[in-house]
Amino acid sequence: MASTYSFDIVSDFDRQELVNAVDQVIRDLKSRYDLKDTQTTVELGEEKITIGTDSEFTLESVHNILREKAAKRNLSQKIFDFGKVESASGNRVRQEITLKKGISQDIAKQISKLIRDEFKKVQASIQGDAVRVSAKAKDDLQIVIQRLKQEDYPVALQFTNYR
């Protein structure tokens, strides 16, 4: 039996599910009557999604489709950081959506401060873009997870690496 138990708090997403969601968006764009002739492009890069279309109204429709497809694939809406809409050539608009991955130092400090303030038997340490939480009892860790799920952070939190 281990003397201490721990888990990691990370902010990540399933890349393959995102690829599938973007593929579904592209398929939807080709089949929807109102979007068929807009020459809308959706390109998935390593750290961003680029959308190019003919109007801001169409862009908003693509946003809604992307959010819907991502939600159906259990991807959090918090991974999308919508950039500003730029004008492109030929009366077109373009927007880059940055994909958020990892917990920033500020958010990691907020999480560890919350854990230190509310749970005296639990230790939290920041390790790069993750937070490691450890305690002597598994029950304490489960209470911490429940408490963190109640908070609303600007990134999606996942709890991994249970030991």
UniProtKB/Swiss-Prot annotation:
NCBIfam families documented for this protein: PRK05412.1
What are the protein's GO molecular function terms? nucleotide binding
InterPro entries found in the cross-reference section: DUF520, UPF0234-like_C, UPF0234_N, YajQ-like_sf
Q: Which HAMAP family does the entry mention?
A: YajQ
What keywords are annotated for this sequence in UniProt? Nucleotide-binding
Q: Name any GO cellular component annotation.
A: cytosol
> What family is this?
Belongs to the YajQ family.
Its function, per the record, reads: Nucleotide-binding protein.
Recorded protein name is Nucleotide-binding protein all4662
**Which Pfam family is one of this chain's hits?**
DUF520
Which Gene3D superfamilies does the entry mention? Answer: 3.30.70.860, YajQ-like, domain 2
